[in-house]
Amino acid sequence: MKLYHSNLNKKSRITRDPVAVSPVNELTALDPKQLKFQIAAALRIQNDYYPCFDWAFPPPITQKTPGSPAPQTLFRHPSVVPGRYSVYLHTPFCQSLCKFCYYPVIPGQQAGEMERYVEYLTREMALYAPELANDRCESVYVGGGTPTYLTPALLEKLLTSIHRHFRLTDDAEVTIESAPGTIPRDKIALLKEFGVNRLSYGIQTLDSALLATLNRDYSVSAAVRELEDAVAIIGNVNIDTMYGFDGESDDALHETLSTFVALGIPCVSIYALDGQRRNREIVRFEPSKDPYYERKIRIFRDARAFLTGQGFEPVLQNIFLQPARASYRHQLRRWNNVTLVALGMSSTGYAPRRIYQNHLSLKNYYAHIDEGKLPILESEEISQEIEIMREAVSQLRFTQVDLARLNEKYGVNLGAVFQDLIEALTELGYLQSEGRVLRLTDKAAPYNNIIPMLFAPDTLKAVIFGLPEEYRENFPLPHVLTQIGATQSAAMNPGGH
């Protein structure tokens, strides 16, 4: 059994994990009169425009604390969304390894290992259950891997265990990921019977020639039949599409989307293929230039225009749905700092003011559970300041941020804290506002991995100077942040209104 996984930073690049040490320089002081010109100059770069979820705030650059905290330690801070939590559960098994995949997966038949893994998942749930007994779970996301590669009996055991250990709300959203060839009609019916009310289907493209180059061995016509059954039985169905393949025509994504719209698919996710990730032998600091950069931007903009013209609304940067027929509460609620319980090998979770990740190997994952411990590899406790900006920055990156609501929730006036930055970005055409609601403009889209990060507290920006020099110089995000320097107009004072 071989586990496939690459260590990645959060910029769509394969690299060693950079860790900041003591900063070597001080952050340049804010000059309100020059800020607009500094931003304009710093953004004259080719950014990595890849619509994906591999963006995170705070960026993973600080030293983590190894070891597994006890549940009461993990949840020692009060939640800013009291009484509610979500669950992410990772199942690493897949029928085969797709050439574009970079997640921790175990391809091929592993029947015995699957049974063992599901058993350990139920034991991990039991470790969390007492600490969460008085709270309600509002969403569950079963990802992978391909969870529907599990047998019907194992899926039934897994879903039953979720309902047994966690108190789901009456309207809880329960999502499971799937792939072509893994959900015959009777399995879809079983999923619905045991509470699944949202299905995400990773089909990527309907171009058979492209599929053959990706190690995706399935019949397009059979996949379409599975989707028709899923829409008929579950209804709330998302399909993952991808573009940027070698030999792909400019119209390939549009043709794929047109077919799905005609099939009545109510939710569509769009991702761009990154050639760097496909080469598992490359480990480098410096990102190469993407010769198809402008083409990818054009294809994505055309796809967005097509979907919005068909009645779809963007709920995240790259996810579009028909509001009356689909929802995606789990992902949206992540950016409200709701507690996210991470289950399974390699899963990443969020306890109040603590980001954590489970062990990356089955051996260590099993060993910790055998010892009665949470299988946590490492964690990072964050300050209240970072917690506030985690919500604000993430919401700006993916949807929009309501400064009035955050002021009410945290007692901090971010409009005053970042007054000069907001004015500069607005004058440059990167930011627009309706009342106290801020959102990125279309002009900002190619820089949506960077512009929201300008709202990071200056204390966090200063940490970037502790990164290796080649990382600071060659990657867009640290390069821009160190060039611009401080962006806070005032100190943050949580609770002060």
Show where each model-derived region lies:
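Short amphipathic alpha-helical interaction segments
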Residues: 412-424
